[in-house]
Amino acid sequence: VWHGWTPTDLIFPFFLFIVGVAMSFSFAARGNAPQLRKVLVRSLILFGLGVFMAAYPRFDLTHLRIPGVLQRIAVCYLAASLLVLYASRKTLYWTLALFLLGYFLLLGSDLTVEGNLAARVDRFLLGGHLWKATWDPEGLLSTFPAIATTILGYLAGERLRPNENVEKGENGHEKAATLFAAGWALILGGLFWSIWFPINKNLWTSSYVLFTAGAALQFLGFLYWVVDVKKWRGWTYPALVFGRNAIAVFALSGLVAKSLILYKVERRDGSLASLYQLLYENAFASWAGPLRGSLLFALATVLFWWIAMLVLYRRRIFIAL
């Protein structure tokens, strides 16, 4: 299905949204300290890591995919940071509106897989360096509305941070209610806009930006109310273990999976299979069947990496950029 969404389509925009939220707290904590150099270095490392993961293990530059998940995070973080640090609040709002409305007008009525303007721009500028032969979900034009997602996260973080509203008597329940209300407004706005501009993750349509940012606001409001207002924090420990080394676990899990797929082993019948395939077949599918085996394999992979990150967490090893 090209248009529409599934729960998995919330993961990436939620991450970009929380990048924006984190920017608000990070920039405020540093005060007037120089921040541009740190932003540039962090963005370059993220982008470079994304390209390295795309190239690994063959490092064939002929058809190396240039866009990617980490590359988009890097560009969105850099662009949003520059706007936040050097543009006025009014300019920030106008830029947000320009990215959403401009993208809507640019794409026009042709939103087909290969015929949309974003895909045509990617083919023209990036040629064979795309995820698919004719398009890329992390392409060039669709990065602009993705930046808007990050900006919305920053604005949410500004609302969430302790400020003068606390001194005026605003309590945590009211702040959580504000986040919920804003979330509903964005969700409804996204659904309404989707009548003309369908919700589409691969195109990162403007309706998708509003819808997912609204959902992220709802989730953020819920977590804020549960963790910071009600002080129910013990259940967050598993997520905290992953969260303190989020980029590390993303990169390492991807590189290990590629390595297991790369190396082939000869079966008894003489056919070749990757270590990844053999692990799945022998440890899970052989007794649980292909469907349940696939689920169990995925859960076991998550558990393996959680334990690995737990070791780092307990040793206070946090790989930060």
Predicted features along the sequence, with ranges:
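Alpha-helical transmembrane segments and their immediate juxtamembrane cytosolic regions
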Residues: 1-321
